[in-house]
Amino acid sequence: MSLKDLINKNLSHWVAGQGPERDIVLSSRIRLARNLDTIPYPNRADKDSKEEVTKRVLDATSKQGKIKLHYIKMDDLPEVEREVLVEKHLISPAHAKAGEGKGVLLNDNETISIMINEEDHLRLQVLIPGLQLEGAWETASELDDLLEEKLDFAFSQKWGYLSACPTNVGTGLRASVMVHLPALNLTNNINKMLGAISKVGLTVRGIYGEGSEYVGNLYQISNQVTLGHTEKEIIANLKSVTSQIIEQERQARNLLLKEKEIEVRDRVNRSFGILSHAYQISSEEALRMLSNVKLGIDMGIITDVDTGVLSELMVLIRPAHLQKLEGKELTPTERDIKRAELIKTRLNM
């Protein structure tokens, strides 16, 4: 596969597309947890039960007619292909691990994914670029309604939608945004902001969800609970907090230009120099340097590189994407070399 093919055909819309506040908010995500009534949850289900879930879901999605979805059986994919789906945020790391009955449904531009037999029978996700929580919710809600016409979801009048995880009981809704906050980090305000978020019913994770590290100044902010709040309330709260975070990040960027312009320009250009000339580079270092360069582009320090290229590289430099591009398994050192080559090539395209 050529670099051009990988970029043009294998980048999800949330990476390559445009959206409101895109310089700070990389993506908006809505995820709904649903289970079929009378069938055990995946962690207690046998092979036949999981196959029955898959059969019912595929039958329901094929009959809804409005949204074209393609089914992928996880056991049919080699490990690197499963990891590519994780790196594109289309499936969870847990879903990529070997196990019977697992599958995923995707639409053409990968804004919609439905994991089958993950922690719940269905994890329906809509992922789009920029701050578009309402738009993502509208799409997710429409598909949820279409599926509920064909499937009997486990639902309690008292508790709402039932889930294998207590924190998902209620609406089953997890709304999240992925944000790039380098200036808050550079002005030493990031910990204060993260602490404030936890006090308003939200949580902050790394870019791959629970248990993942913060890298490249990227943070995933989402609601903590789904019980006792309507979907609109959850989304409105997250959007309001995100808007405040955006404003704080913009103020921090202005402060840096006003009080530390030389230091910021030096950091940005040093990072660009490393990315442009490194012979090998680790994923962690590359993400740090890309974060600095993206900040420089967004602040007008670098003017001859499209900020979209930086967003693309944040995905393309991951281990599975590099190995898919090369068409073979790579050692860590080989990945570091190929990562440096890819970055140099892409920055000069």
From Swiss-Prot:
Keywords: Allosteric enzyme, ATP-binding, Kinase, Nucleotide-binding, Transferase. GO terms for cellular component: extracellular space. GO terms for biological process: phosphocreatine biosynthetic process. Its EC number is 2.7.14.1. ATP binds at residues 27-31, 89, 123, 174-178, 205-210. InterPro entries: Arg_Kinase, ATP-guanido_PTrfase, ATP-guanido_PTrfase_AS, ATP-guanido_PTrfase_cat, Gln_synth/guanido_kin_cat_dom. It catalyses: L-arginyl-[protein] + ATP = N(omega)-phospho-L-arginyl-[protein] + ADP + H(+). This is Protein-arginine kinase. It comes from Halothermothrix orenii (strain H 168 / OCM 544 / DSM 9562). The lineage of its organism: Bacteria, Bacillati, Bacillota, Clostridia, Halanaerobiales.
